[in-house]
Amino acid sequence: MARVCEVCAKGKVSGNVVSHSNRHNRRTWEPNLRRVRAIVNGTAKRINVCTRCLRSGRVERAL
């Protein structure tokens, strides 16, 4: 299962952590995903959605 939002396609991002002594260490940032039941094409389906999509109302939740 890929750590990607199925609504906005937000995924893993890589970059550097920079310490006070200016050392650079590679790391990754992963999106804050939730597995929710949502209405997709008229049927309820479990999808991975980032919390920004949930808060902004881009996902119609299935109850």
From Swiss-Prot:
Pfam families according to UniProt: Ribosomal_L28
Keyword set, alphabetical order: Ribonucleoprotein, Ribosomal protein
GO molecular function per UniProt: structural constituent of ribosome
TM spans (from-to): none
BP terms from Gene Ontology: translation
Family classification: Belongs to the bacterial ribosomal protein bL28 family.
Protein name: Large ribosomal subunit protein bL28
